[in-house]
Every structure is written in C-alpha cells, then in structure tokens.
Amino acid sequence: MTNFPIPEMAKPYLEYDMIQNHTELPAFPEFRARLLYACLQSSGSGEAPGDEFRLPAVGGVRRGMDELYTLVTSLVQMGLDIHDMVPESSDRKEKRAARSRQLKVLAGDYFSAKFYHLLAQAGQIETIRHLSAAICEANRLKVNLYMLMKQWKLTAEEYVHQTVNIRMQLFLPFRSKMQGVVSGLWPDVLHSFTRCEVLAQEMRRLDSPQSLRGSWAYWHLWQEASKEERKQLAAEEPDPLKIRSLLHKYNAGGHLFHLLEAQVQHVWSCVKQLDSDKLMQEITQLVETFAAPLRKMKVLEER
C-alpha cells in the first residue's frame, strides 16, 4: 500500500496537551481519508502548493495538493466528530466532566477552522467554498437524523442511509479534483466504502449492549420488538442481559453480517470498473479490512 502520510501530518494540529489530558479525541477518519488520497493520487492531481506555502514535512518530503486536500478534510471531519461527542445534557457538574465538555467544543471549532487557514494559505478559495457548503449539508443532515430519532420514526435501514450520507459529505466535493473513470465512479465508490465502514462499526457496537442506544441494532430491535420489549429498550438504563437476549432473539448480528457481506460485494464490483491497476490494488487492500473478518466469521459458523 502506498505510504499514507496524512495522520503524521495531522499530528501538529491534533496533539495538544490540554486536549489530550482532559478529553478524548474521535478516531481519525482513516478509511475515507485513505480512499480519497488514493483516488487523488491516481488522478495525477498532485501539483505542489506555491513557494509561500508549506505543509508539515514528513520524512523531509515536500507535499502537494493531494496531501493538503486529504489533511484538511480529515481535520474538518474530526472537528465535526468531536462535536458529536459532546453530551446532550450538561447536568453533570463535576469539574473534570465540565472541562472535558468545554474542550470538546473548543477542539471541534479549532479543527474545523484549520481547513480555512490551510486552504487560504494555499490560495484554494474555491475549495474553501465547496468544503464550507459540504459542512453545512452534513450539519443539515444531522439535524434531520436527530429529529427522526426524537420522533421515534427511524428504521434501521434509514439510520444506515442517513449516517452514510452524513459521513460522505466532506469527501464528495473532491470529485472535481479527479479525472477520467475515477471521477465518474467517485460518488458510488465513496458511498459503498462508507457504508461498509458504518456497518462494520455497527457490528462492533453489538459487543457493548450498555451503549447500544441510537445504533443500528437499537432501531432494528425497536422495529421488531413487542410493546413490552420496547419498554426495556426505552428505559433510561436498560438491563444489559435483557438487551443481549433481544439481540439474540432478533438476530441482530446475523442481519448486520449479511448487510456488510452484500456491501463488500458491491465494492468489489466498483473496483473492477477502475482503469488503474495501482488504484485497484490500493482499494482492494482497503476493502480487505472489511472482507477478511467476514470470511473468518463464516468459517467459524460453518464448523
């Protein structure tokens, strides 16, 4: 796999003692960032910024626009994600909890603002406009999702659909920086890949019934459960043992497995349409992140 310098380049913006000591950061958007970087590199869009602009050096190598676009998009995504980690209620008055909440808000604002600063330095005004519009659209979609949740009108499939659309938004505008077949396939590849990412994350959430609220499994159970079972789901502190029983009863893990398996197959069909062997190899290795665990699970089931 091609060297991926973005996490290292992001460190100067992410590693602040105050943030690290008093709150937690969301995960770096590794998969979507790798996908974007690979497609930009394949399109040959890697012109270098002007002499007046310097990205953080990694291994002494000067970086170009592919790195800049991927870096700023990743920083904005982390800014939006850390804002999502801010608790809805501020009832907890402990000094540590209050400080963590405040720093999440400030860190999110800081990461989100960095894209403007870095792109402006590089003279990328049009990219600022496109990325700003994408941020607005992502926030609009989040509001729609939260409203459906509060009104209890959300289905499990709608939850996945909405979550995927939200996570795609910041990466979609870079289609204009791509060329040829890659440009045409970018929306479908990004959608399929992001859906794999979401479904894989939802499968991992099954291991923590105590934090299942708002997940795919939660809405799946809500659709299938009886009136009495819904009361258990809606409880402020649901019994983990009862939730595990419901997950087993309504085969949440099995449904997610088949959804992810089907989505991985769709990604493979997209990959076969690419006209670059190098890019096909890059994306194949990324898809294997999702495909390999599925194969292992299937082998275990067949024993």
Regions found by a protein language model. Give the residues of each.
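All-alpha prenyltransferase/terpene-synthase fold signal
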Residues: 1-303
